[in-house]
Amino acid sequence: MVKEPNGVTRTMRRIRRIHFVGIGGAGMCGIAEVLLNLGYEVSGSDLKASAVTERLEKFGAQIFIGHQAENADGADVLVVSSAINRANPEVASALERRIPVVPRAEMLAELMRYRHGIAVAGTHGKTTTTSLIASVFAAGGLDPTFVIGGRLNAAGTNAQLGASRYLVAEADESDASFLHLQPMVAVVTNIDADHMATYGGDFNKLKKTFVEFLHNLPFYGLAVMCVDDPVVREILPQIARPTVTYGLSEDADVRAINIRQEGMRTWFTVLRPEREPLDVSVNMPGLHNVLNSLATIVIATDEGISDEAIVQGLSGFQGVGRRFQVYGELQVEGGSVMLVDDYGHHPREVAAVIKAIRGGWPERRLVMVYQPHRYTRTRDLYEDFVQVLGEANVLLLMEVYPAGEEPIPGADSRQLCHSIRQRGQLDPIYFERDADLAPLVKPLLRAGDILLCQGAGDVGGLAPQLIKNPLFAGKGGKGA
């Protein structure tokens, strides 16, 4: 029997078994977990087992390793990510048998349809902002359902079924699938030139798609928009929905002043219309996280959450996996090095993290291990990468994570090393994806350094390995 939270209409009443093709993906596993908790039968396939598939299996999902037509036998609907095409044997078999095959975002839209949906869109900051909203709502006693692209450290998962009518989720523009969503509240954090293949290389088309997404709101909904971003500011006059703006700009409806950062913690004062100034702090570094917090405060205030709960939810926020996640200290001669892991894979995200490190730890050197993600992104944003990566004190560049793409001449890590070296300020070190990083990086480290491992590919496995490596006599720490 499918269970629904109080006040939520039961959905998909003709559907019993739901099969996910690519169930281990960040965008897929959260939806699968919520559906399992609602009482649906869930199965799924992926190319390899992982901690994610093992977790879903413990919750009752049937997991298949590898893609075969028979995996989907008995399914009433297939859910696919944008990485799965019609030639996939499970998809081909379902289409032949006239079983519905729906994109991930359409299934998310079904979960959101009869709930008070809060969708967070934007090129950068979606995961952290969605996580902050879920945390503040929980602090306010609203117990939301959430589906997030990263693991919320406090919950130990990236998805959870709540008892209230609220559902908080990321809205993915990478394949324009966020157009399936019809939320009550939508956030746009920023709009940048990324995933341009989806939009035929046309930035105007990307902007128009964000406008279309915001007009999926009902006429009584709410658009929450960051006016510090020039593109968001540009599209603002086109939005015919109730709107609240936020940012550091003086004309923002909700803005932050008196910003101060010490290490991981950032303090600031929030100014809101017809409200007393609110002093808050968040256990995350950087101005970008002040903006993520402001979006959260706008929505929490609009939903009637008390200032006390807002302050508590932000102050106690334990972060998200791979978003400036502090693993602990690596022991080196004369002291230790702080080890940080981060998912940032766009020059703007890299710049935000470097700025946060310089702001919170101004006396420390930054030793950076970076892996570009996709050859197309490296090609399209090449000069931006050269500029921002050159701001590290020491740089090691791992070969590009292809994400299924074929190599593009001149858009790889060797060429990036060459271009950065030509600027004359830094001598980057190139290494292959299967190289052992520990003996390579240890001679480069000094006591007091910050070692940042950053990128969206398999670079994400390096920090967990380094903290356990006997070369560093590592002392583990909690994620930030």
UniProtKB/Swiss-Prot annotation:
Localization: Cytoplasm
InterPro entries linked to this entry: Mur-like_cat_sf (IPR036565), Mur_ligase_C (IPR004101), Mur_ligase_C_dom_sf (IPR036615), Mur_ligase_cen (IPR013221), Mur_ligase_N (IPR000713), MurCDEF_pg_biosynth (IPR050061), UDP-N-AcMur_Ala_ligase_MurC (IPR005758)
A Pfam family hit: Mur_ligase_C
Positions bound to ATP: 122-128
Pathway(s) annotated for this protein in UniProt: Cell wall biogenesis; peptidoglycan biosynthesis
Disulfide feature: none
Principal location: cytoplasm
SUPFAM superfamilies: MurCD N-terminal domain, MurD-like peptide ligases, catalytic domain, MurD-like peptide ligases, peptide-binding domain
Domain of life: Bacteria
Protein EC: 6.3.2.8
GO cellular component: cytoplasm
Keywords assigned: ATP-binding, Cell cycle, Cell division, Cell shape, Cell wall biogenesis/degradation, Cytoplasm, Ligase, Nucleotide-binding, Peptidoglycan synthesis
GO molecular function: ATP binding; UDP-N-acetylmuramate-L-alanine ligase activity
Catalytic activity from the UniProt record: UDP-N-acetyl-alpha-D-muramate + L-alanine + ATP = UDP-N-acetyl-alpha-D-muramoyl-L-alanine + ADP + phosphate + H(+)
Secretion signal, residue range per the UniProt entry: none
GO biological process per UniProt: cell division; cell wall organization; peptidoglycan biosynthetic process; regulation of cell shape
Stated role: Cell wall formation.
UniProt record similarity statement: Belongs to the MurCDEF family.
NCBIfam families linked to this entry: murC (TIGR01082)
PANTHER family: UDP-N-ACETYLMURAMATE--L-ALANINE LIGASE (PTHR43445:SF3), UDP-N-ACETYLMURAMATE--L-ALANINE LIGASE-RELATED (PTHR43445)
Protein name: UDP-N-acetylmuramate--L-alanine ligase
